[in-house]
């Protein structure tokens, strides 16, 4: 071939070869990416008009791209932000469930106590008048301690109720025996015989059982709602690892870099990314489900035998019945007290001229358990607990379900019906890898997210422990055992208020001065060695008191 022909053909062939490339460059314009990128609020100055070589990319495929280094960095941060918002949005239901139901239950309970105290005060003012008003602090202290217990105060319910009846006995004993003067020591002796004398009939024993188990259940339940609220709020605020952020960027915004801003991730691809990013949250699910089950058990108690509403509504009537029992048995009670504590000194003439008040004989209307009032919180306990139970059941398995819930969102993925025209991490095609199981240990072979299965998230483990502790307290409350929410360091305190003697097996015989007054600190226990010594000295002291009493009797 002549040289001049070769000189003409070769440039022409080179020109023809470049024509498809030029057409291809025009087809790979970044105009769609520019529009989508600008809609995110980013500056268009970052983005080229046409694809450029992608050797600078650190996350997306290093092919021809519409992304600069600055774009990849910004879109990486955007993917992190969107992921955090998605998790918080997806867990919104469980968070609002615990926040709103805790608020309702707390309002209901506090108002129930306020109404019960007001009802008792109104009834006793009408019935006993000045006598009640002069001794009203005994009843005010009862409700103050009940409120303090409910709010987490270190109150032993049994000790507190025993103290209430002992104080009431002291006041009543003076009122039915106005002809005598009683010293503080004598009244202290009187109070020691509350259990043995049963001056108030069987009301204190029954009320103690009802109040303790109802308050234990109610307080533990509201504490459970608090813990659930706090755990849900904390876990919903995720901090993705660097490996997770890379996977999120690759899934959500590498399509932009490939010039495919409208192509969304494949559903299964999304699941693997989310399971890797939320592996620790999924591990929370087991303990969370046990916690929800325990909450449901206590809720059943609140609906049934531990119903705080059925205990507090008629408490004024029950206490008034106890007072009438005391009035009816006043002579027998006084005789036994005089026998055990000695004959009191006569009162001055002016005071002894007064007789025992007649108005203790007033009878009250019987309480109708069918009268289930609603409070300003807007409901009765039955309806409130039923509503809470329904919401609790819906919150089970919420943490392991997060990846599925997020990946069902049409804003995130192409959906399960479009498995061919979706982004698989490299191109627009079907996603082939298998879906990982839930939990940290199952992510060892996750193809999308680098997960160190040997290093569980410390923060999530703390939430698991908080749930475990609360579940144990709920189980105790279900069985009627008290739980100390403030100070759990003293293991010698056992199960607190719920571990006392509340059944018919308790001693009921009247005894002379061999019963100690309630301890000031219910959590403090004497050592066994010192207890045995004290028991011996107490027996000796009892014998001395018996001799003195007999001498006085036959003098």
From Swiss-Prot:
InterPro entries: Glypican, Glypican_CS. Residues 531-555 form a propeptide. The keyword Signal applies. It is found in: Cell membrane. PROSITE patterns: GLYPICAN. It comes from the Eukaryota. One of its GO terms (biological process) is regulation of signal transduction. Pfam families: Glypican. Cell surface proteoglycan that bears heparan sulfate. Putative cell surface coreceptor for growth factors, extracellular matrix proteins, proteases and anti-proteases. Enhances migration and invasion of cancer cells through WNT5A signaling. This is Glypican-6. The lineage of its organism: Eukaryota, Metazoa, Chordata, Craniata, Vertebrata.
């Amino acid at each position: 071939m002549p040289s001049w022909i070769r000189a003409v053909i070769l440039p022409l062939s080179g020109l023809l070869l470049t024509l498809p490339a030029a057409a291809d460059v025009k087809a790979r314009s970044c105009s769609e990416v520019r529009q989508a990128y600008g809609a995110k609020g980013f500056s268009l100055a970052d983005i080229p008009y046409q694809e450029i070589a992608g050797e600078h990319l650190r996350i997306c495929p290093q092919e021809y791209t519409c992304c600069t280094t600055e774009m990849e960095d910004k879109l990486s941060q955007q993917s992190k932000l969107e992921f955090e918002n998605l998790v918080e949005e997806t867990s919104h239901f469980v968070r609002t469930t615990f926040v709103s139901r805790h608020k309702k239950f707390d309002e209901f309970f506090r108002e129930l106590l306020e109404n019960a105290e007001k009802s008792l005060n109104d009834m006793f003012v009408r019935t006993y008048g000045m006598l009640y008003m002069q001794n009203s602090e005994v009843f005010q202290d009862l409700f103050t301690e009940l409120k303090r217990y409910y709010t987490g105060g270190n109150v032993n319910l049994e000790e507190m109720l025993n103290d209430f009846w002992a104080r009431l006995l002291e006041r009543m004993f003076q009122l039915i025996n106005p002809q005598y003067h009683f010293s503080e020591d004598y009244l202290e002796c009187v109070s020691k015989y509350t259990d043995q004398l049963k001056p108030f009939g069987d009301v204190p024993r029954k009320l103690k059982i009802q109040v303790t188990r109802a308050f234990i259940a109610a307080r533990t339940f509201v504490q459970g709602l608090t813990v659930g609220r706090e755990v849900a709020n904390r876990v919903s605020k995720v901090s993705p690892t660097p490996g997770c952020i890379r996977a999120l960027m690759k899934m959500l915004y590498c399509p932009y870099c490939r010039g495919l801003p409208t192509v969304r991730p494949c559903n299964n691809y999304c699941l693997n990314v989310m399971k890797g990013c939320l592996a620790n949250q999924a591990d929370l699910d087991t303990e969370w489900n046990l916690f929800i089950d325990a909450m449901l058990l206590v809720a059943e108690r609140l609906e049934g035998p531990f119903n705080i509403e059925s205990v507090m509504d008629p408490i004024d009537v029950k206490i008034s019945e106890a007072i009438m029992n005391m009035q009816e048995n006043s002579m027998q009670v006084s005789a036994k007290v005089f026998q055990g504590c000695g004959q009191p000194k006569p009162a001055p003439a002016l005071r002894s001229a007064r007789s025992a008040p007649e108005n203790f004989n007033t009878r009250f209307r019987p309480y109708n358990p069918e009268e289930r009032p609603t409070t300003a919180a807007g409901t009765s306990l039955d309806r409130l607990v039923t509503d809470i139970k329904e919401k609790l059941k819906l919150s089970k398995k919420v943490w392991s379900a997060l990846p599925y819930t997020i990946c069902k969102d049409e804003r995130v993925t192409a959906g399960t019906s479009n498995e061919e025209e979706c982004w698989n991490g490299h191109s627009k095609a079907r996603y082939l890898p298998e879906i990982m199981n839930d939990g940290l240990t199952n992510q060892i072979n996750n193809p999308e997210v680098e997960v160190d299965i040997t290093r569980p998230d410390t923060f999530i483990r703390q939430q698991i422990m908080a749930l475990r502790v609360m579940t144990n307290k709920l189980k105790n409350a279900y069985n009627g055992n008290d739980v100390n929410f403030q100070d759990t360091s003293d293991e010698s305190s056992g199960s607190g208020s719920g571990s006392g003697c509340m059944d018919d097996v308790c001693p009921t015989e009247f005894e002379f001065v061999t019963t100690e007054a309630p301890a000031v600190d219910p959590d403090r226990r004497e050592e066994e060695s010192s207890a045995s010594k004290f028991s011996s000295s107490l027996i000796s002291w009892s014998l001395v008191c018996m001799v003195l009493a007999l001498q006085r009797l036959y003098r």
